[in-house]
Amino acid sequence: MGDTPFKATSMEDLNDTISKIINYRFKNDAILEEALTHPSLNKRNSKNQIENYERLEFLGDSILNMIVSAILFRLFPKEKEGALARRKTDLVCGNTIANVAKEIKLGNFIIMNNSERCNGGKRNLKNLENALEALIGAIYIDGGFANVKKFVTKHWEERAKGMLSLPQDPKTSLQEWTQKNKLPLPEYELMKQTGPAHSPEFTISICIENYGKVFACASSKKVAEQKAAELMLEKINNSEKTI
């Protein structure tokens, strides 16, 4: 099938094809369709509610983080929290998720409007990342935790085992990238702090020349800065990478 967009005659046909790739067949075709529908389609259901993959993406992101955390906890019993967190950050970053999506050729199945498709939407790394997270959420809704755990473990455990050394943290990677490209070093700005003292949330921003600004939130400044750096690296990669 290569990189040719898949043309299904029905959702059942699409379900049959994808089931052979992911080793899971959806009981509810509608859940699969929602997981593959890009927001550009502006699809609405009988209740006039917008149906696309964004809600399932939100769910799938949390499920992926949980299962990958459990995999790392099992594989690296002697490592401290900080080291495990660095491994997880690398395993659940946008680039890794998009690479898994490319391995299963998920872009061929994303449903989007003509404009998005003509602009390379089926190869866009962010679209691939979002659709795969939505697919993970959909497998959980349709088939339960055991099935989604099987899918995530298949595609992430070997990656985790292959991490012979700790990955570089996103802040260091971003700093090295700016130095290499002769740009000012990234500055992390605290935009706001919300929530009670015992459970605060920090919003951090970074602005890189020619790439604009990104924002990230977390329960500590350190984690928020790492997330912001990761988002900026993904933004840079999406802007520069030719797929």
From Swiss-Prot:
The gene is rnc. Residues 169-238 form the DRBM domain. InterPro entries: dsRBD_dom, RNase_III, RNase_III_dom, RNase_III_sf. PANTHER family: RIBONUCLEASE 3, RIBONUCLEASE III. Belongs to the ribonuclease III family. Mg(2+) binds at residues 57, 130, 133. Keywords: Cytoplasm, Endonuclease, Hydrolase, Magnesium, Metal-binding, mRNA processing, Nuclease, RNA-binding, rRNA processing, rRNA-binding, tRNA processing. Homodimer. Its EC number is 3.1.26.3. This is Ribonuclease 3. CDD domains: DSRM_RNAse_III_family, RIBOc. One of its GO terms (biological process) is regulation of gene expression. The active site is at 61, 133.
